[in-house]
Amino acid sequence: APSDTTIAETLTITEEFFPD
């Protein structure tokens, strides 16, 4: 399973591509 750091990085990158 991915580490919490990897999950956090993914969420940050997702925010860049799909900003609220």
From Swiss-Prot:
GO terms for cellular component: extracellular region. Residues 1-20 are annotated as: Disordered. It is found in: Secreted, Extracellular space. Transmembrane segments: none annotated. Signal peptide: none annotated. Hemolymph. Keywords: Protease inhibitor, Secreted, Serine protease inhibitor. GO terms for molecular function: serine-type endopeptidase inhibitor activity. Inhibits trypsin stoichiometrically. Also inhibits chymotrypsin very weakly. This is Trypsin inhibitor. It comes from Mythimna unipuncta (Armyworm moth).
